[in-house]
Amino acid sequence: MSWQAYVDDHLMCDIEGHEGHRLTAAAIVGQDGSVWAQSATFPQFKPEEMNGIMTDFNEPGHLAPTGLHLGGTKYMVIQGEAGAVIRGKKGSGGITSKKTGQALVCGIYEEPVTPGQCNMVVERLGDYLLEQGL
């Protein structure tokens, strides 16, 4: 399966039990900042934004004072899982990023999708990739 198929079929799909509800944007990004696959709506990000996210995975709390920036949008960092998941909130939407062995799985949402639904979609694929050694 191609990386783009993972984004299209496992991240940008309808959320279970909520037909028509899906993430706003999603991507799989290598830990070096290279985009492996993304939805057409995923924001163009700066290398330093991805570096900040990677630093927070290695040094939990790094982004808390400044917020998580992606594509010029600032998200307030909220509870995540140190070294594994970073979550951010902005208004009625937010972002979830799950670290795997080689990549980051990122999902961005807006209402009516809930933070929990975004977490479920992103973390399920991230856990699967971890199980596959990726």
Swiss-Prot record:
Annotated compartments: Cytoplasm, Cytoskeleton
GO cellular component entries: cell cortex; cytoskeleton
Residue ranges annotated as motif Involved in PIP2 interaction: 84-100
Q: Which cysteines are joined by disulfide bonds?
A: C13-C118
The family database entries (Pfam families) matched by this protein are listed as: Profilin
Post-translation: what modifications?
Phosphorylated by MAP kinases.
Write the record's keywords in alphabetical order, separated by commas. Answer: Actin-binding, Allergen, Cytoplasm, Cytoskeleton, Disulfide bond, Phosphoprotein
Q: Which GO molecular function terms does the record list?
A: actin monomer binding
| SUBUNIT field | Occurs in many kinds of cells as a complex with monomeric actin in a 1:1 ratio.
Family the UniProt entry places it in: Belongs to the profilin family.
PANTHER family this protein is in? PROFILIN (PTHR11604), PROFILIN-5 (PTHR11604:SF25)
- What else does UniProt say about it? The variability of the residues taking part of IgE-binding epitopes might be responsible of the difference in cross-reactivity among olive pollen cultivars, and between distantly related pollen species, leading to a variable range of allergy reactions among atopic patients.
Q: What does this protein do?
A: Binds to actin and affects the structure of the cytoskeleton. At high concentrations, profilin prevents the polymerization of actin, whereas it enhances it at low concentrations.
Protein known as:
Profilin-3
Q: What is the lineage of its organism?
A: Eukaryota, Viridiplantae, Streptophyta, Embryophyta, Tracheophyta
